[in-house]
């Protein structure tokens, strides 16, 4: 698939040079918006705006949304005011908000200047919500019904207004004060008799979120309940917007990427790897590397403290890397398992005792198994024929058991503490590592 995509990109590049615009249009309209956006991102030259003008209006808007920030910025700089207005008018309101949030001030002014009055007002209202909240990712383009409307009236409203809505599969029922009282689907409306009123077929037990709820919690609800859209209400239960499945998927991807970067001791980045400069990557990585280097000094201090003991049985020092490494791996296993469970809502801080008890039993089993394997290895290969071999083998193996127990308990407990006090548990995965703590 990637080879085919590269071939298409090169074909388009050649056709663009030869100014065969009709052929270009015929090729582009057969592609999906995401694939077209990928081609635009690979081209990245002054002719990109010219290629964009070839696209039909609706396809152009769908493609524009899929592009990265740099490509969008390049296109906007090449647009006339009229062209910019046409693109903005075709975008859903949440996509306009995303665009405004990512662009520099001079570009934002152009975008808002070309937007109509209602769009500007809505964008400004959505921008007031905190970053990473449900309000910041919701859209205000949805179908609203009244409980006294009939199925026939509802379907007529959907036909009349649905073309400008982001989704029409789920309709939201509100009272005269805009309070959310129920939901119904287009399927239910179509399968009902024309004279049946909405209040008879709507579902009243509505799952919704508040505008200030964290976006990660919102995205997780999509996973738990298989929603296509989720209503967003204010503190008085008034419907103010909805979050759609495409935005929830974006949030899950962003959060997963951020967690992976934090667990690898890298500060999160908004740009794709290939579009991030060397200095940009350096700035993201060096702070945590400095922290981890300093935390490693604790290990050195402990070893120095027991230098005299190690000098008397010098062979013990050769097993330190194995013990600390195994302890670090054991702690990492526990940390990852607990962090994942916390992220999925499977455990909370109130489950700490149960989690610690489970990890303690796991650590005993793992510790005894590894210690037994290690003892056999020491007796056969490492200490065979040496003085005090049995004593050294027992000391190393028992130390290994204790290290694994301590590492797993600390590795499972720290993420829960961090989650309780509002700190991202992923930060503790590397600062300091369970390996350092187990030492």
Where do the PLM segments sit?
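Alpha-helical structural signal
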Residues: 36, 48, 60, 108, ...
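Acidic-residue sensor for enzyme active/binding pockets
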Residues: 255, 359, 435
């Amino acid at each position: 698939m990637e080879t085919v995509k590269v071939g298409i990109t090169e074909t388009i590049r050649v056709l663009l040079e030869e100014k065969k615009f009709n052929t270009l249009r015929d090729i582009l309209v057969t592609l999906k918006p995401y694939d077209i956006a990928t081609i635009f991102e690979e081209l990245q030259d002054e002719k990109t705006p010219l290629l964009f003008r070839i696209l039909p209006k609706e396809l152009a808007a769908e493609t524009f949304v899929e592009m990265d920030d740099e490509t969008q910025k390049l296109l906007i700089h090449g647009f006339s005011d009229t062209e910019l207005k046409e693109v903005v008018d075709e975008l859903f309101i949440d996509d306009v908000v995303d665009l405004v949030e990512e662009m520099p001030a001079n570009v934002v002014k152009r975008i808002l200047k070309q937007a109509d009055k209602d769009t500007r007002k809505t964008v400004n209202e959505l921008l007031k919500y905190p970053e990473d909240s449900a309000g910041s990712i919701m859209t205000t383009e949805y179908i609203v019904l009244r409980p006294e409307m009939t199925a026939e009236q509802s379907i007529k409203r959907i036909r009349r207004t649905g073309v400008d809505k982001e989704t029409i599969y789920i309709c939201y029922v509100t009272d005269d004060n805009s309070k959310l009282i129920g939901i119904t689907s287009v399927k239910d409306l179509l399968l009902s008799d024309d004279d049946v009123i909405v209040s008879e077929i709507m579902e009243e037990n509505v799952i919704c979120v508040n505008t200030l709820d964290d976006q990660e919690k919102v995205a997780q609800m999509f996973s738990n309940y298989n929603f296509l859209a989720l209503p967003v209400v204010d503190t008085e239960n008034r419907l103010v917007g909805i979050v759609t499945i495409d935005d929830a998927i974006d949030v899950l991807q962003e959060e997963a990427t951020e967690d992976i970067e934090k667990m690898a001791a890298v500060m999160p980045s908004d740009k794709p790897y290939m579009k991030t400069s060397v200095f940009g990557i350096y700035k993201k990585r060096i702070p945590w590397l400095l922290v981890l280097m300093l935390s490693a000094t604790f290990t050195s201090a402990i070893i120095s403290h027991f230098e005299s003991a190690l000098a008397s049985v010098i062979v013990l020092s050769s097993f330190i890397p194995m013990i600390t490494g195994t302890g670090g791996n054991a702690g990492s296993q526990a940390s990852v398992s607990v962090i994942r469970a916390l992220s999925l809502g499977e455990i909370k801080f109130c489950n700490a005792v149960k989690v610690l008890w489970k990890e303690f039993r796991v650590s005993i089993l793992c510790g005894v198994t590894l210690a037994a394997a290690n003892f056999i290895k020491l007796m056969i290969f490492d200490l065979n024929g040496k003085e005090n071999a049995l004593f050294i083998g027992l000391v190393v193996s028992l130390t290994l058991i204790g290290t694994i127990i301590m590492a797993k308990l600390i590795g499972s407990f720290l993420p829960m503490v961090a989650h309780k006090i509002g700190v991202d548990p992923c930060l503790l995965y590397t600062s300091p590592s369970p390996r350092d703590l187990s030492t």
